[in-house]
Amino acid sequence: YVAGTMGSAHFWLGTAAGRTFIASPMCEVGSVGIMLTYQSFKEYFRKQGIDYREIYPDSADLKNYETRAIEKENNEEPIKQRLAVMHRIFCDAISRNLGIAYDPELPLFRGQIFTGDVAVANGYIDQFGTLEDAVKWVLAQATVRKVNEMYNI
């Protein structure tokens, strides 16, 4: 049930549900993407007279190599490569959960946020409804399951 924003990891989780309900066209869903924020305080520490060092053994030469590439060479590519792998895993899960083919050009898989009406029209959310509607649906599913168990269906 969506009563506000169902974005990113929340969208991933929500699409795994048996049915999704959204309260209003004003609600938002989507944001299938991944990002990383990088900050270095080394220059600040240096200006404060603090000698900040990261020391690695030769046997752990790949430890934190992505951030070290940024610090030493201003090279974001190693991090972008890892993020691309994680993004594809995210997209594949959404694709599987929604039953739609992965298309890297589709705005859904490029991080766009959609209003409730667009999300329902595109099949990203099953239907508009209230929390009560969602609870009734869950109870109905439980009843059907119980009847099926009773009659070995």
Positions of the model-derived regions?
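N-terminal organellar transit peptides
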Residues: 1-27, 32-153
